[in-house]
Amino acid sequence: MIQAIVFLPLLAALVAGLGQRAIGATASKILTTGALFTSCALSWPIFLSFVMGTGEAEVVTVLHWVSSGALQFNWELRVDTLTAVMLVVITTVSALVHLYSWGYMEEDPDQPRFFAYLSLFTFAMLMLVTANNLVQMFFGWEGVGLASYLLIGFWYKKPSANAAAIKAFVVNRVGDLGFMLGIFGTFLVFGTVSIPEILTAAPGMAGSSITFLGMRLDTMTILCLLLFIGAMGKSAQLGLHTWLPDAMEGPTPVSALIHAATMVTAGVFMVCRLSPMFETSEVALGVVTFVGAATCLFAATVGTTQWDIKRVIAYSTCSQLGYMFFAAGVGAYGAAMFHLFTHAFFKALLFLGAGSVIHAMHHEQ
């Protein structure tokens, strides 16, 4: 069941993308949208079983992936309460965005390519949230980055779209450098990349120190801060937020998908998933709280001065993500995830509403 949820969008993306000439635009659209609605229909029962309290956390092994010295891990799909919430958010919003794109992209000659990118994006995000080890999470993380680059620069004949896509890609690489260093450091300290093993061992590492750039620093603080830099890049927090407003150059359905449901929530998800690590470091939690609060105020203030309808919503998203990080920083992970869940739906609706307005005004923003 979980394999179907995760791999159906990938299958649809490959067929629609590579076979677009053979099967035509309409078949591509039907295939990708159908796959997404199937994934969505399969993920709701999982979510509801966790809501009712009957759901069991499980790990499904897909294949043995890497075995190199001490570095050994499988490709595994992990289903627990946190994953169940994200599955529902991602598949539902993505399915609705696919459906909306039928009308919105009607006159575009490159429809199969667009739908293939959307499905690929969804697959990468599902890969990220079902990850049971940090390397698989990084795979999903980079996949989302790549797909967002392709989608933001979808109208590649527009110079502004190209510039925005490259900007989003580069700013995210800055954050990803921190995330990579965090993963390397975690492997160095714990000797494993498996998330459950790391979270079990994390409290025991509290108070230990490590040499970093020639200074003795608290191990858990430095690891959590490096991981959080990754979250800042992906979730457009203060300092690495510059790509988010420019990412509005893509088609409106892309904005709804990237900025409401999926990509920007990856950072919040990661902080919540690794919360036992962050709990061991007061400093790291303080930084998360401060950055979240600062972003929340800053982005909302900037948003009030914008004239472009989509940019206003983009800054609003930035501000709401600040709230989520603030909640995570003060230890209210439930509140952070609840806000993530509710925000995804209303923000996607706002973007799609804005898209309808722009469409009706003949692309006047």
Regions found by a protein language model. Give the residues of each.
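N-terminal signal-anchor/start-transfer transmembrane helix
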Residues: 6-21, 95-96, 232, 236, ...
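Hydrophobic transmembrane alpha-helices and their helix-loop junctions in integral membrane proteins
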Residues: 96-140, 146-365
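Transmembrane helix-loop-helix hairpins at membrane boundaries of multipass inner-membrane proteins
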Residues: 1, 19-116, 188-215, 221, ...
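Hydrophobic alpha-helical membrane-embedded or membrane-associated segments
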Residues: 8, 13, 34-37, 264, ...
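Mature extracytoplasmic enzyme cores
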Residues: 1-7, 85-88, 138-140, 150
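Residue-level signal for short hydrophobic patches within transmembrane helices
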Residues: 4, 11, 15, 75, ...
